Design a protein with these regions (language model features):
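Active-site microenvironment of metallo-dependent hydrolases
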Residues: 1-19, 24, 345-431
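Active-site gating loops and adjacent loop-to-helix segments of metal-dependent hydrolytic enzymes
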Residues: 62-95, 121-125, 152-173, 229-253, ...
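Alpha-helical scaffold segments that flank or form the walls of functional sites
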Residues: 65-142, 174-189, 423-431
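Metal-coordinating catalytic core of metallo-dependent amide/deamination hydrolases
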Residues: 124-260
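Glycine-enriched alpha-helix->loop->beta-strand junction motifs that scaffold or abut catalytic
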Residues: 215-220, 251-254, 270-279, 300-305, ...
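Histidine/acidic-residue-rich catalytic or RNA/ligand-binding cores of hydrolases
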Residues: 229-241, 267-272, 289-298, 313-329
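His/Asp/Glu-enriched, well-ordered alpha-helical/loop segment
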Residues: 247-254, 296-377, 391, 401
């Protein structure tokens, strides 16, 4: 048992002063408003529920600051990403992912949904999968491994299926049965669990979705959806339906559509009516020039929203939640597209729910995952407590608790100099 004492904490959306949080075996068992005791672990500043990173590709972090020289497009960026994927071994993947997950913790993330499609099972068996699971445990972050089905190279402009290119072979299990066999052999460690993903309608034929749904019943299921207009055009050419309509049988509270940038009104109604989640990744969607998706429209239709760092060009949960609001302001010319509480919910409880965890809330029975933020930095000084997350950055995170254990203390991670770890891991992959 551990007792934490928060100077102030967000409970049920309300900033509450002087809160003692008692946890047993990683679960919050009691909340009381009381003065601090000598035996309490003090959490200064404002304590938020743990922040959820709903969508990540850890190895993409190696490309940060390396893709801007010639502009290019999403599709040319993808070729650079393939080049990194081709160089990874289980050992180098473990080193890189450990450092990336440590960076996420320093930024305040407590759980990550790792959208994992680098398998290469014919060469490594489950070693690449095991490396990611072990990296999360090494860093101390909670993780849902979204084990991804990826069976073909994409679609032509006319909608015809394309075979896997040589650089995509490492992503594929060859068949749904091959994916299911490998998936069943995975052994998640403590604080990790398995989810599943369809990479996209480009990479998996819709004829397989019913069997995939049966194989993954009860697990969180994610898919990239309508990130680029070309995907919509290809799907319409191939099947006469949008990606969301093709995925209709998978929609529901356990399903998350990642990006959802270019959606029709029918798509919005389908996602909202099924109570699906849509995971927006504002910093990546800016970086890759994807566009700005209809987040407020989805929320109004009944969908939940979550947030992710995706390619990890930026790892800052506060920038993602700000981006959800600020990007819509630019598109609509209106402020207040979301309330501060709605933004925090997307970054916490709704993100946890989309990854299959009972967390993202400071409440009895919830996982004891907490993020403490300084209220006195040059960025947060003077900010209203109930809007602090709209002023803070990752740099303002002081303490992070996962499963009742402190994993970031005073802005420091147990692995040491995370910047140096990242530099070494990236050099190992790129040079």
């Amino acid at each position: 048992m551990t007792t934490f004492w928060a100077e102030s904490a967000v409970i049920n959306g309300v900033v509450t002063p002087s809160v003692r949080i008692t946890e047993v075996d990683g679960v919050i068992t009691e909340l009381t408003s009381t003065p601090v005791r000598e035996t309490d672990r003090v959490l200064p500043g404002l304590v938020l529920p743990g922040l959820a990173n709903g969508h990540s590709h850890a190895f993409h972090r190696a490309l940060r600051g390396r893709t801007h020289g010639d502009g290019g497009t999403f599709w040319t960026w993808r070729e650079q990403m393939y080049s990194v994927a081709a160089r990874l071994t289980p050992e180098s993947y473990y080193d890189l992912a450990s450092a990336v997950f440590a960076e996420m913790l320093l930024a305040g993330y407590t759980v990550v949904g790792e959208f994992h499609y680098l398998h290469d099972a014919s060469v490594y068996g489950t070693a690449l999968d095991d490396a990611v699971l072990a990296a999360a445990a090494n860093a101390g972050i909670r993780m849902t491994l979204l084990d991804t089905l990826y069976l073909r190279g994409g679609l032509s402009a006319a909608g015809g299926p394309l075979p896997l290119a040589p650089e995509q072979q490492r992503f594929s299990d060859g068949s749904l049965a091959g994916w299911a066999t490998r998936h069943a052999s995975l052994s998640p460690a403590r604080n990790t669990r398995l989810g599943a993903a369809i990479h996209s309608v480009r990479a998996v034929d819709p004829d397989l979705y019913a069997d995939f749904r049966t194989l993954t019943a009860g697990a969180p299921v994610h898919a990239h959806v309508s990130e680029q207009p070309a995907e919509n055009a290809q799907a319409l050419a191939a099947w006469g339906r949008t990606p969301v309509r093709l995925l209709e049988q998978l929609l529901g509270p356990d399903f998350t559509a990642v990006h959802g940038t270019h959606l029709s009104e029918d798509d919005i109604e389908l996602l909202g009516g099924s109570a699906s989640t849509v995971c927006f990744c504002p910093t990546t969607e800016r970086d890759l020039a994807d566009g700005v998706g209809p987040a407020s429209g989805l929320l109004a239709a009944g969908a939940a929203l979550s947030l992710g760092s995706d390619q990890n060009a930026v790892i800052d949960p506060f920038e993602e939640l700000r981006g959800l609001e600020m990007d819509e302001r630019l598109v609509t010319g209106e402020r207040g597209r979301f309330s501060p509480g709605q933004l925090l919910s997307a970054a916490t409880a709704d993100g946890y729910r989309s990854l299959g965890w009972n967390g993202g809330a400071i409440a009895v029975g919830a996982l004891c995952d907490l993020t403490a933020v300084s209220t006195s930095s040059v960025r947060t000084a003077g900010a209203a407590a109930d809007q602090l997350w709209l002023a803070a950055t990752a740099t303002d995170v002081t303490t992070v608790v996962v499963n009742g254990a402190v994993v970031v203390d005073g802005g420091r991670h147990p692995l040491g100099d995370v910047g140096a770890l990242l530099a070494r891991a990236i050099e190992e992959v790129l040079l």
